[in-house]
Every structure is written in structure tokens, then in C-alpha cells.
Amino acid sequence: LECIQSKKYDLILNIMKILHTSDWHLGKRLDTYSRHQEQVEVLDEIIRIADAENVDIVLVAGDLFDTFNPPVESIDLFYKSLKCLANNGERAVVCIAGNHDSPDRIEAPDPLARECGIIFVGYPNSEVPLFKLDSGLEVIRSEAGFVELKLPHCNEPLRILTTPYANEIRLKSYLGVDDPETELRKVLKDRWQQLAEKYCDISGANLLLSHLFFTKEGATLPEEPDDEKPILHVGGAQAIYTSDIPSQIQYVALGHLHRKQIIDQEPCPVVYSGSPLSYSFSEANQTKYVVLLEFQPDKRASLKPIELHKGLPLKRVRSQGVSEALEWLKQNPDCLVELTIVTDAYLNASDRKLLNQTHQGIIQIIPEMLQGTDSDGNPQTTNINLSKGIEELFAEYFQHTKGLPPDPSLMELFKEVIANKKDF
């Protein structure tokens, strides 16, 4: 009853409620550790927030999956979660592809999804078919890169400029530009402006939904997350300036960066909602959010970040020796750990076994070797570079423990053992 009364109140005030989320990365692992159960729990939390806040539409700004070919359990979780969010067509859900997603996979279930009020946009030039549901949800107008919706419990329409991820060459191709010298920024700015002038007036809410790298011109670029496929690289897509956004747009809902952040407030809030879980140790201790927006015609969007509480915290821990590490692990069981141990000798197999038996959430153990002292008597350390090849690491270990390098015959034997293990 409270939900119905609240929705009637919003309708009287012409308030449209939008929930912005992104970067679900379903199927993501932390090294070999599955995050599936955490993803189940955090998506259920997002569904509960959407229900509690009487949200009219949910926007998912790309990186729905972590790979082009996600596991079956992740696909199942994705569709079941969207169906719950859509609430039998009473609430619209719009999802776009990110740089981790296969656009064809994202769009494949679109005909069936539309029957539930779910819209998938895989490509920058995708055009959403017109449709109307018994709930009152309707696509009123549509063309490549644009969709206008009539939401069941809102008086005013919602206009969305949709720009899923594509690399620079493909983006230009999709938007009909063949000149390789034309800047991507100009191509997008011109296209967005054309759509905004055609469709986005003050009689409805107007927003941009994208999975690209936005920045304020002249500002320091935000860091792309660790373990993330970067966008800013040769063959990717250049950074887009907030000044390229049409003045008619009231909010820009972005995906790609995993930390919730407001890139700019002009010409409107330009916001990365961030991922719902911490997916790498560079995100350790980050608080995760979804962003609730309240729209009224011809007014600035009102933002309310809502904190998410599900998922195991990620911890980076540095300990002086194995004993100190064991004590910390016993006192902090409910987390995922990147453990650095300062030691004067390589960790042996029994030490590693004891550490892993003590804590089920150890993702990586990094030995930090003592290398004597500096001129002031302070201990000097160096991390073992785990990005090196296994053969190089073995040679360094042998040198450290024996005081001389392994001879060629021993290295050949080591290579044979490793090869047999891979075959096995």
C-alpha cells in the first residue's frame, strides 16, 4: 500500500525515478576464485532497492558480462535478475553493451525481452523497434542511437541517447563516417547534437547512456581499473569531453570505470555509477553504489547514491613473516586477501599450505624478500615479480637458495616437469 501511495505522489509531482548501475561483469573471477554467489546477492540487493524506491526505469551502462562467452550460470543469473527488475513490464530496463560484451549476444534475446519491458542495445547504430505493453510501457519513437519511452507510471516521456561501446574505427563506421582523420569526439558530438535537437525538448526527461571514457577537457584522466580491458589505447576509443554533451541532456549515465564518480556537473551531471562489487585489489576498501535519479521536466536531475552492502571486502595485507600473517588471517575470516609477506627466505610448500588452510579467501601470496639494510640500518625489501615466466622465477629461487645459478641440464629437467604437468 505504501508503494502505491508513494507512486501516486510521484505521479502528481511529475517525478520520474531512474536507477543507474553498470559493470556487473557477470562470470568474473578474482584469479581462480568465483564471484558468482556474491553477484547473486548483490543483484538481489539492487532488485530490492528498485522495489523499495519505486523506480520507473533501470539503466545498466555496459559490461553486463565479463567475457564474450560467459558461463551458463551467469547467463541464467542475468536474465532472471532483469526479469525481476522489469516487474512484468511495470518497470522498463535498458541495457547497453560494454567493451567486455558481445553486442550480438546482448541483442540476441531482444524480441523476447521486449515482452517483459527489457530493451537491449548492442551497437551504437542499433534501432529499438516500436512496441507497447499492456502495462502502459511503450517505445514512442526510435532511430539509430535514440529511443523515447512512455513509462507506465510517469506523465512525461523519457528520451535516451544510446551509445554502447565500440572501438573508434567501428564507431565511425556505424555512424556513417568514413574519413579516418575525423576526430571521434566530433563525430559523436555532431550525432548527439542532431538527435538532441530533433527529439529532446523540455516536455520530457533527456539523458545519455554510454560505455565510453569521458573526462573534463584539461582534467587529469581517471584511472581505468586493474584487470579491466582498457578503452584508451591504440585501436580503442579516445576520451570524450564533457563539453561534447548536448545542452538538452540532463544526465549522463556511464559505465566502464569501477569507482563511483562524478566527472563533471556541466552541462549536467556526468556520472560513472561504478561496479556493484570490487573486482580487483586496486578497488580494495571502495564503497560500491547504485545511483538513484529523480527527474522533473526542465529541471536539473536530483542524485542520490545508494550504498551497496553485499559482497566480500577485498583486503591488501602486508605482514612481517608467516606467524604475523597467520594471526591476521585468523582474526579476519570474511574477506578476500592479497597477502604480502616480508621474509628473508622463499616461502616453502608447508608455509603456503598452512596459510591457505587457515583462510579460504587467500587469492595471492606475494613474498617480499629482505635484501639487507640501507646506510641508516633500515631493512630493504624487494617484491618477487610474479609476472615473470615460471622458468625465470625458478632460476631466481635456485640462485637464492643455492648461491649459484642452475645448470642447463637442471633447467631442461624443470622444463620437462612443467610440460608434463600442463599435459596432465
Q: Language model features by range: what are they?
A:
Residues 3, 9-90, 104, 409-424:
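N-terminal active-site segment of His-dependent metallophosphoesterases
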Residues 132-138, 142-156, 163, 268-332:
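Binuclear metal-dependent phosphoesterase catalytic core
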